Amino acid sequence: MLEIDNQTPLESDFLLLEKIADVLASTQIIELVLVSDETMREINRDLRDCDYATDVLSFPLEAIPHTPLGSVVINAPLAQENALKLGHSLEDEIALLFIHGVLHLLGYDHEKDKGEQRQKEGELIKAFDLPLSLIERTQEC
């Protein structure tokens, strides 16, 4: 189940994200928080000691029954900027960031694993007919 806290002017029905959440964690609650660039910078600075806005952060919660899996926080203005720059829709960009964030909630870590997160992202991207994944875009730079 997906709970959405949209703190931005972005309007969407978020149906694609609900489908993705159902595939990845059908029995758990995932919180999606859409924030401004400045709010994301504050979160990143306060919680990770990184004084810049990033596109997506994930915050897993303890594995306690009947509690949310965790929160995925997405920087909506940066997602819009990247969607325009990369030539795909904002909905697709947010879906890519959401997949990336939820996989972190599920324990995947592309900085430490041996390609498992990249492989899982690839499977989901194909299943939902999405453009290039966040990990693959980052590796191309």
Swiss-Prot record:
Q: What biological-process GO terms show up in the record?
A: rRNA processing
Superkingdom in the source lineage:
Bacteria
Q: What cofactors does the UniProt entry give for this protein?
A: Zn(2+)
Q: Which GO terms describe its molecular function?
A: metalloendopeptidase activity; RNA endonuclease activity; zinc ion binding
Q: What does this chain do? A: Single strand-specific metallo-endoribonuclease involved in late-stage 70S ribosome quality control and in maturation of the 3' terminus of the 16S rRNA.
Quote the HAMAP family the UniProt record gives: Endoribonucl_YbeY
Family classification: Belongs to the endoribonuclease YbeY family.
Please report the name of this protein according to its UniProt entry.
Answer: Endoribonuclease YbeY
